[in-house]
Amino acid sequence: MIAKTSTISHGANAIRYSVNKEKADIVKANLLPDNISPEAMYGRMMLVQRKFAENINKGRPLGRNVIRIEISPSEEESRGWTMNDWASLSNEFIRVFDSIDLSQKTKRASSKQTNLKGSQYIVALHRDSKSGILHLHIDANRVDMEGRINDSHKIGERAVMAANIINERRGWVQSEEIGIRHKQEISNCCMEIFLSLIHISEPT
C-alpha cells in the first residue's frame, strides 16, 4: 500500500471531485451529516474555521485549508473487500497518521500529532479509470473541532510512515519496495522501446 498527502487551497473542488466522480462510493463522513452535498460539506468545514478564526493563523484565513489524502492498496491486498473493509482501513490509517510524532524532525511542538479523528472529513472510494484498481480519497478539515490546526509540516512524510506501519502490521509490501518495482518496470519498458528502435533502424 502507498499513501500520499498534501494540504490544498482548492478544498471545495477536491471534495466535489471525491464525492461526484463517476462510480465513487462514500465510505464515511466524519463529524458531518450524511447525505449532504459536497458544497455543504466544505461549507461546514469553513464554518468551523471561521468560528476559531481569532485563534488560528493570527485571524487570517488559512490559504491551504484542507488536507488531501490518497490511500492505495495493491489489487492483491484489497481483493474481495467490502465497504466495511475500506472503512476499517480508513479508520486505521487516520489513527496511525494522528499518532506519529514528528516534533523532533520539525523542531515544532505542533508536529507532535495531528487530530484528524477529531476533525471533519469525508472518505470516498474511487476506481482508477484505466486499471480499475480501487483507492481511497480523504478530504479533511485543517482545523479540528476544538479549533486546533492540524500541522502540515512534513505531512507527506507522515503519510508514508503511516502507510509503512500498516503495511508492516498487515504483512503488505512496503511503499519503498513498490517504488523500486515501479522504477524497474519503467526501466524495462524503456529498454524494450530502445531495442525495438534499434531493430527498426537496422538496414534490411
List each model region and its residues.
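Ser/Thr-centric signal marking residues that sit
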Residues: T204
